[in-house]
Amino acid sequence: MLPVTFLGGIGSGLAYAGGNTFIATPDRGPNATAYNALVDDTSSYISRFHTITLDLTANTSGTGLAYNLMPTLTATTLLSSATTLNYGTGAGLGNQIDGTPLGSGAPTLNLTNSTNYFSGRSDNFGTANALGAPNSTSANPSNARFDPEGVRVSNDGKSVFISDEYGPYVNQFDRTTGERIKSFALPANLAIAHEFAVGATEQLATQNTSGRVTNKGMEGLAITPDGTTLVGMMQAPVARSPTS
């Protein structure tokens, strides 16, 4: 178990926000420790971005590099939706490591703050399909599971754009509140038709014949200098792609 105050990694994405300020995204949360293999050891860790400052000072010690870099965390902003999100119930997915039932994938802060937080837990998806296909797809913007990767700041500095591996998704969030402003419709061939809490099952050709490769979604995100166009980069070719 990790304390809620544990910062963890911030290396999924880094975006310049002016001056000495940067926006950093951590991954979907801790899953390196055995927790529950039926949800890929993911937890209800709330997706977020960090605001940090990076200060350079001259190194006068006479050894080492010419400058010292001092990072300072100034804010952590949790990502949420004003509309209802799909969370897993935990039914049929076994127990937590302490033997208690896995339970809902909804973060407990949802009730406290009367909102709907995005989370890294892998079963946080629903059956409703926003694309109108016969089956649910991973592009459903109502799914709560969100694995932040690339990040860019809008030209006016008021919002951030974050790409993800689960959908893949590209969402726009208010930089102050963390509430989602918009979910962009991406090409349909990037999504998978059948979602599972276990990534290895999702990736079986018997389950999905096309779409993003598990854990290799929209890893990178760029924005043009005029701020009008986002450029997303997939970590790997989509499944069964004819070229690599």
Q: Can you describe what each PLM-predicted range is?
A:
Residues 1-244:
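Sequence/structural signature of beta-propeller domains
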